[in-house]
């Protein structure tokens, strides 16, 4: 142990200082110092790490993280430089031994991010995967209705059927109107002819006055055979025509009776 913390365990008595194996002509061990730019709290200090020295004095240090952490290891990379006159004092508190060792090199490393091991990178990859899946999903949603669309031939057939239905409806409406006009004209002409015949009977000196017990419009009106559609369309119109004919007949009868009394 070195530094002020190690000096706190020293008392005033004299101790024997020994030189370590690093001072031998052919040292069997070497001591190094490592300086980290940042050391995460996720590193498991109870486990051993791995130090590799490559070409050009490049150093790679791999330290395991706490179980369950992402990523499972933390990697540091840097370089080492040799020491010239630096030493380190090692104190064994169990035996009270003090040993001086010569430092071989100073290693300075920086934390790096291993591909696929960074938590931020993992989240970014998830977002990229989601963004990649979204266009594919939208394309499926957009293209699926197009497959269900009708073919051009079936679409033209539907349009043709609709046009034919509209034309048939227009023909029914026009035939209904023409039938109504012809029926109105026939009804009015029959009423006029009935009125003329009644006047001739009333003012003729030879023929007796005869009044038809039947309704003029019922006896003189021609019979028409109409379809069910025409009957439905003109039911109200026929009812109004019948009412007008009845009123006219009653009016003519009252006038003829007043003339005979005079």
UniProtKB/Swiss-Prot annotation:
Classification via InterPro entries: EAF_fam, Tscrpt_elong_fac_Eaf_N
GO biological process: epithelial cell proliferation involved in prostate gland development; intrinsic apoptotic signaling pathway; negative regulation of cell growth; negative regulation of epithelial cell proliferation involved in prostate gland development; positive regulation of DNA-templated transcription; positive regulation of transcription by RNA polymerase II; regulation of transcription elongation by RNA polymerase II; transcription elongation by RNA polymerase II
GO MF annotations, alphabetized: transcription elongation factor activity
Phosphoserine carried by residues: 146, 151, 154
Pfam family, one: EAF
Domain of life: Eukaryota
Membrane-spanning ranges: none
Broad class of the protein's primary localization: nucleus
PANTHER family per UniProt: ELL-ASSOCIATED FACTOR 2, ELL-ASSOCIATED FACTOR EAF
Subunit details: Component of the super elongation complex (SEC), at least composed of EAF1, EAF2, CDK9, MLLT3/AF9, AFF (AFF1 or AFF4), the P-TEFb complex and ELL (ELL, ELL2 or ELL3). Interacts with ELL and ELL2. Isoform 1 and isoform 2 interact with TCEA1.
Function (record text): Acts as a transcriptional transactivator of ELL and ELL2 elongation activities. Acts as a transcriptional transactivator of TCEA1 elongation activity.
Name recorded for this polypeptide: ELL-associated factor 2
Organism: Mus musculus (Mouse)
Record lineage: Eukaryota, Metazoa, Chordata, Craniata, Vertebrata
């Amino acid at each position: 142990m070195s530094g002020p913390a190690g000096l706190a365990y020293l008392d005033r008595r004299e101790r024997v200082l020994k030189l370590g194996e690093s001072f031998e002509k052919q040292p069997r061990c070497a001591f190094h110092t490592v300086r980290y730019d940042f050391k995460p709290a996720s590193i498991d200090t109870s486990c051993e790490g791995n130090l590799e020295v490559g070409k050009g004095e490049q150093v790679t240090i791999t330290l395991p993280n706490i179980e369950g952490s992402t990523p499972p290891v933390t990697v540091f990379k840097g370089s080492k430089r040799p020491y010239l006159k630096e030493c380190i004092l090692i104190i064994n508190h169990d035996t009270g031994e003090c040993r001086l060792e010569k430092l071989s090199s100073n290693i300075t490393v920086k934390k790096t991010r291993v591909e696929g091991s960074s938590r931020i990178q993992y989240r970014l990859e998830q977002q990229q995967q989601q963004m990649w899946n979204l266009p594919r999903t939208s394309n499926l949603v957009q293209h699926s209705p197009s497959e269900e669309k009708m073919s051009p031939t079936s679409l033209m057939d539907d349009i043709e059927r609709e046009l034919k239905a509209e034309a048939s409806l227009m023909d029914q409406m026009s035939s209904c109107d023409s039938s109504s006009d012809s029926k109105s004209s026939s009804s009015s002409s029959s009423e006029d002819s009935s009125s003329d015949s009644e006047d001739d009977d009333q003012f003729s000196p030879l023929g007796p006055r005869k009044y038809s017990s039947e309704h003029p419009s019922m006896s003189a009106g021609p019979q028409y055979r109409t379809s069910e559609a025409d009957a439905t369309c003109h039911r109200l119109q026929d009812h109004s025509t019948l009412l007008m004919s009845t009123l006219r007949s009653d009016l003519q009868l009252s006038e003829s009776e007043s003339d005979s009394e005079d």
